[in-house]
Amino acid sequence: MHYQNVRAAKFIDRPNRFIAHVELDGSVETVHVKNTGRCRELLVPGCTVYLEKGTNPNRKTAYDLIAVEKGSILINMDAQAPNKVFHEWAASGGFAPEVTAIRPEYAYGGSRLDFCLETPRGPHLVEVKGVTLEENGNALFPDAPTERGVRHIRELQRAAADGLDATLFFVIQIKNIASVAPNDATQPDFGSALRDAAAHGVRVLAYDCDVAPDCLTIRREVPVIL
């Protein structure tokens, strides 16, 4: 996926989940943050961030904050990007060449899962999780507790028990990641639910991405350490 009209800026602070203050062209600009997560390890005062200029002249902020430099690592932190890049990748045959249709926001059980992929074997349910937390070349998920994430895992496990193909798919919004693992220190029940689901038929996959300030593309499979 590609962004348009991307600018570099210097991060100042984040007064709430939705906006941040940055220095752009010598002036302080209020921008929309496209990730309501904590991102405390990413949004450090003085770091370089990347902004996409919005196209709606009536919006309150002119720019969206979409990526950040963490030392020498560029991390895409757009929470909407993982589903978009997965959809592009699956549509091009990356997930499975036999996919004949992609149905987003698929209602199953008491939840809406991100995708239902139609295949000759039948429906394949996929829940996508974007990963932005990096430690020593490895990735962890989640960066903050997510009860919704646990609920989605349990829905996938029910789907597998019903005989459907079901996959939890981590899109790591960082390049050259060695592995990804559940962040048990932050949310032990997410890791427990993921391990239980994997033991009962849910496939767990992870791919890292090629990341540029104006682009994000699924790259290669990364080991999942359960």
Tell what function each PLM region has:
Residues 9, 113-143, 156:
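Conserved catalytic cores of phosphodiester-cleaving nucleases, focusing on short active-site segments
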Residues 13, 53-58, 172:
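Short, charged beta-turn/beta-strand-edge "cap" motif at the junction between a beta-strand
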Residues 16-21:
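Short aromatic-glycine-enriched beta-strand elements
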Residues 37-50:
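Short nucleic-acid-contacting surface segments enriched for D/E, G, S/T with interspersed K/R
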Residues 40, 72-104:
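Acidic-basic catalytic patches of nuclease active cores, encompassing PD-(D/E)XK
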Residues 56-73, 218-219:
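OB-fold/S1-family single-stranded nucleic acid-binding modules
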Residues 137-147, 154-186, 208:
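Nucleic-acid nuclease catalytic cores
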Residues 173-226:
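Domain-level recognition of nuclease-like catalytic cores that cleave nucleotide substrates
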